[in-house]
Amino acid sequence: MAEYTFFTNPMSRGQIARWALHEVTADYEHVLIDWQAKPAEFLAANAMGKVPTIIHHAESGDRVVSESAAICLYLAEMHPEAKLGPSDDEMADYLRWTFFAAGPVDQAITAKAMRFEPSSPEQEGMLGFG
């Protein structure tokens, strides 16, 4: 059995998690998820039904991680030999920029792709764009 099971859809943010899996040279099974027909194994691991999701088949038992940024941080922590994580002095910036990219930047890009434009500075603020 592979060390990880990776559930994703090519049109999701799963490519970010896939990159991280490759960076740590993880042994993983790649499972493509159809948006409308989510398999029971996937929903048992992640009842929210969101991709990407990984299952880490650790010696102490299976661990489920979802959300691209969380998967990247988890893999960096589990595979220190890959040197993806920060030093202690870099930790604050590492967390700030990781969550900024996963939050406001991602929301703004998605809104733009969906052709949604905030109509006022108040809407931009409420959406977390600024």
Question: Language-model features: where?
Answer:
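GST-like domain detector, emphasizing the conserved glutathione-binding G-site
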Residues: 1-126
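Aromatic-anchored helix/helix-loop segment that forms the rim or "lid"
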Residues: 130
